Amino acid sequence: GYLGAPAVVAPGAPLAARAYAAPAYAAPLARYAAPVARAYAAPVARAYAPAVAAAPAAVEYDPHPQYSFAYNVQDAHTGDSKTQHESRDGDVVQGSYSLAEPDGSIRVVDYTADPVNGFNAVVHKEAGAHPAAAPVAVAAPVAHAPVAVAAPVRAYAAPLARAAYAAPIARASYGPALAYGGAYH
């Protein structure tokens, strides 16, 4: 028969009656306790001395600042040639710097700065002490022979076989009987 069909049972003898004891409940235990009295200590009063601000360190101020510096670079290996010197007397700064240009000339910049006229620079060029380096000849680009590339080979394989699985096993279901034998109401 069909596995999902309900089972019909017709026993010949009546089913045995079952007896159950009446439920018994214990009386609830009523336990009430008085709340616990808690004592807290008063907060501790603390006295702090007021913070003392440190006196600012005295900043040294020079009402008439003065300085002077200079440097000179002459590198025969790289051809680097530059100089600078600068001096300050109060609010007036005077200086000059020079450097070698790629064309062999020397650029000289004389500058001054003061509170009345601001920053002023005068630029002039001097003929070079060494000639400019000759331009380097650039080699023509190398033409490479074309590379032959084979066309890709297209090959197709049969599809992979898939694993086969059996159908699920039918499960028996259980439920109450449709009828019981006997005329009991």
Swiss-Prot record:
Its job: Component of the cuticle of migratory locust which contains more than 100 different structural proteins.
Keywords annotated in UniProt: Cuticle, Repeat
Gene Ontology molecular function: any one: structural constituent of cuticle
Organism, as annotated: Locusta migratoria
InterPro entries cross-referenced by the UniProt entry: CHIT_BIND_RR_consensus (IPR031311), Insect_cuticle (IPR000618), Insect_Cuticle_Struc_Prot (IPR051217)
Protein name: Cuticle protein 18.6, isoform A
Sequence repeat residue numbers: 21-24, 33-36, 41-44, 54-57, 133-136, 139-142, 150-153
Matching Pfam families: Chitin_bind_4 (PF00379)
GO cellular component, one term: extracellular matrix
